[in-house]
Design a protein with these regions (language model features):
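Charged, non-catalytic accessory extensions
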Residues: 1-14, 19-20, 24-27, 31
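Short, contiguous acidic/charged loop-to-helix segments that flank catalytic cores in large enzymes
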Residues: 9-16, 36-43, 79-82
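Catalytic cores of nucleic-acid endonucleases
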Residues: 20, 32-34, 62-110
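Conserved catalytic cores of phosphodiester-cleaving nucleases, focusing on short active-site segments
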Residues: 25, 29, 47-50, 57-66
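Beta-rich nucleic-acid/ligand-interaction surfaces
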Residues: 39-53
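Short acidic, glycine-rich loop/turn motifs
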Residues: 50-54, 95-98
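Domain-level recognition of nuclease-like catalytic cores that cleave nucleotide substrates
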Residues: 88-141
């Protein structure tokens, strides 16, 4: 099991934040009339595969952070999927409120990685500014 202390507490809190974020994204997808399926945790590239009423796929990467977070990390696989299928990709950002799930806020950032060029950068992940990325988002789409 986990060793008690700050690291174990952080891991437990992180898992709770991620769970609330995914739950919020699943609910938003259902509200849009789509059929979302949560992917296994080890799925590379996206967290939710959603199907539109027309049968089209939407690939959703969910990032949840406690309100006030400065940044977040996105993996190279997540960026590459968003670049390869830009029209079908959504980055869903969920600001998790300490006041409970009913106060969580959600933004969709469509086609965020369309024009990104990592060149020969030997990166495994990229850290993005939460507020600047949040500002590019919209209500669920």
């Amino acid at each position: 099991g986990l060793i008690p202390g700050p690291i174990a507490t952080h891991a437990k809190e992180t898992a709770g934040v991620e769970r609330r974020a995914v739950d919020a994204a699943l609910a938003a997808e259902r509200a849009l009339g789509r059929e979302p399926i949560e992917m296994p945790h080890n799925n590379t590239g996206y967290d939710i595969h959603s199907t539109t009423p027309e049968g089209d796929s939407v690939f959703i990467e969910v990032k949840g952070r406690i309100a006030g977070a400065e940044d977040f990390t996105i993996t190279l696989n997540e960026v590459l999927l968003g670049k390869n299928v830009p029209a079908a990709h959504r980055l869903v950002m969920v600001e998790v409120s300490p006041d409970g799930p009913e106060h969580d806020q959600l933004r969709y950032v469509a086609e965020h990685f369309r024009s990104i060029n990592l060149g020969d950068l030997a990166a495994t992940d990229v850290r993005l500014n939460w507020a600047k990325t949040w500002d590019r988002g919209t209500p669920p789409c």
